[in-house]
């Protein structure tokens, strides 16, 4: 078994409701609302207008910068609106609203690669870019940027199939039902990076998936190795996965690529397979719909832009006593206040919690037990990080306590007996640091422009 990482927690995985349920195809809704930002980086610019006819897989959003990814129509039909709509990250986001014509017309430009084995790394990067593929484990970093920046620098390519968040089972079902997509996608990455093997990291509680993948690897004679990992949260975090499989620790302030590792989510790998072998860009997402507030939990494959209310409807609806909705897992997901938000490329789960779920009340008084320090997988000191942030000392939080190294896994908040909002506070701290950096950059650019104007 692979190495264990420091810290971590063992929450009840709560996967029994869906881990034996096959993925169901959700019928496309009458209307999809596709946000122009489903990735880290610059939002896309809409390239369609009201009244335009669109087809499945047609590009409707042009990347707004280098770190960006195009967006495609998930249904065929007519553009009904291009306007701000409620967004899962909060507030609103410019979105393209498409009225479904239910003809399922596919864009004529979509076609598979004639000879996948002959693809050069540069050609694969271009295919991935045009397909709008991003990290689908939640981070949503554009995959073509990750590949191109890692070429010639990494010797470990790892597929993240840990799926360590409670409730979520979409990756597990994908491995059981679509193992060829996983292995062929991994093989494309092996050839692209020029590595002898690609490693797939799977937690020990999914041994049946590991067995299915190993059988497929043998049948395809693929350069892929399955590594069974300890069942511990957050085993699927990039830096912890890098350490578990390669034995290398990512330095403070650095990325896995700086330790010679490049890590891809399992569904991202399947999207690479689809882009090459079918030509289809990212137009759908497997989503686990679960939680005590869901009448009939399921794993659903949904068109991008499907309103989350349609997912719950397909699962028999919500219980009356439901009090909270979360997009993503319970540890790192985001609470939602609006049923009009829609499925995006990084949506792995929609959870609903009813009145019978255990609820806690946050208490402001830290008892200095140190549990948060013992479970932090980054070896940080959340007890002090929180206190300095509450005092407004962001400088000490950032530079002395290395607050920017926090991976926001939520292990500290999970174990805190005082129920202090530690993870939320650290996210706010990061936002303050990033805002200060952006302000400093804008000031420097303005001063430079003023100096150049004066010289002219």
Which residues fall in each region the model found?
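N-terminal, Lys/Arg-enriched amphipathic/low-complexity engagement segments
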Residues: 1-47
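Short, well-structured beta-strand-loop connectors
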Residues: 49-62, 81
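Conserved hydrophobic positions within beta-strands
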Residues: 77-79
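Acidic low-complexity segments
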Residues: 81, 86-141, 151, 207, ...
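Gly-rich Lys/Arg/Thr-decorated short loops/hinges at beta-loop-alpha junctions or inter-strand turns
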Residues: 106-107, 135, 157-171, 293
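Hydrophobic alpha-helical positions that pack around
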Residues: 162, 196-308, 314-319, 329
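Histidine-anchored nucleotide/phosphate-binding helix
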Residues: 176-192
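Ferredoxin-type iron-sulfur electron-transfer modules in oxidoreductases and energy-metabolism complexes
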Residues: 347-363, 373, 377-456
């Amino acid at each position: 078994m692979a190495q264990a990482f420091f810290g971590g927690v063992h929450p009840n995985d709560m996967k029994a409701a869906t881990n034996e349920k096959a993925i169901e195809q959700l019928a496309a809704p009458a209307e999809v609302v596709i946000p122009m930002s489903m990735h880290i980086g610059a939002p896309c610019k809409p390239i369609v207008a009201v009244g335009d006819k669109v087809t499945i897989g047609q590009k409707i959003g042009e990347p707004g910068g280098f770190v960006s990814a195009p967006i495609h129509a998930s249904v065929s039909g007519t553009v009904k609106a291009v306007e701000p709509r409620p967004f899962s990250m909060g507030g609103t986001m410019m979105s393209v609203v498409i009225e479904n014509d239910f003809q399922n017309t596919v864009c004529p430009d979509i076609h598979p690669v004639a000879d996948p084995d002959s693809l050069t790394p540069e050609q694969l990067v271009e295919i991935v870019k045009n397909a709008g593929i991003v990290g689908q484990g939640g981070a949503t970093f554009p995959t073509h940027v990750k590949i191109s920046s890692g070429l010639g620098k990494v010797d470990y390519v790892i597929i993240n199939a840990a799926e360590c968040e409670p409730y979520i089972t979409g990756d597990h079902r994908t491995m059981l039902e679509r193992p060829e997509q996983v292995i062929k996608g991994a093989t494309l990455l092996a050839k692209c990076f020029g590595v002898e093997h690609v490693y797939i990291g799977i937690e020990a509680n999914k041994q049946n998936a590991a067995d299915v993948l190993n059988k497929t690897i043998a049948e395809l004679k693929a350069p892929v190795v399955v590594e069974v990992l300890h069942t511990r949260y957050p085993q699927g975090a990039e830096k912890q996965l890098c350490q578990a499989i390669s034995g290398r620790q990512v330095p403070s302030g650095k990325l896995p690529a700086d330790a010679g590792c490049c890590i891809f989510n399992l569904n991202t790998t399947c999207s690479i397979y689809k882009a090459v072998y079918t030509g289809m860009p990212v137009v759908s997402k497997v989503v686990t719909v679960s939680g005590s507030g869901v009448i009939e939990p399921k794993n659903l494959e949904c068109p991008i832009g499907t309103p989350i209310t349609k997912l719950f409807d397909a699962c028999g609806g919500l219980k009356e006593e439901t009090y909270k909705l979360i997009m993503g897992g319970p540890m790192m997901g985001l609470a939602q206040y609006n049923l009009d938000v829609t499925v995006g490329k990084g949506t792995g789960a929609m959870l609903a919690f009813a009145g019978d779920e255990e609820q806690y009340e946050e208490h402001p008084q830290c008892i200095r037990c140190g549990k948060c320090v013992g479970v932090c997988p980054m070896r940080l000191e959340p007890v002090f990080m929180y206190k300095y942030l509450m005092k407004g000392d962001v400088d000490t939080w950032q530079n002395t306590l290395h607050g920017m190294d926090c991976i926001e896994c939520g292990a500290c908040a999970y174990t805190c007996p005082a129920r202090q909002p530690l993870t939320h506070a650290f996210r706010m701290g990061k936002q303050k640091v990033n805002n200060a950096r952006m302000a400093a950059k804008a000031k420097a650019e303005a001063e430079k422009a003023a100096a150049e104007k004066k010289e002219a």
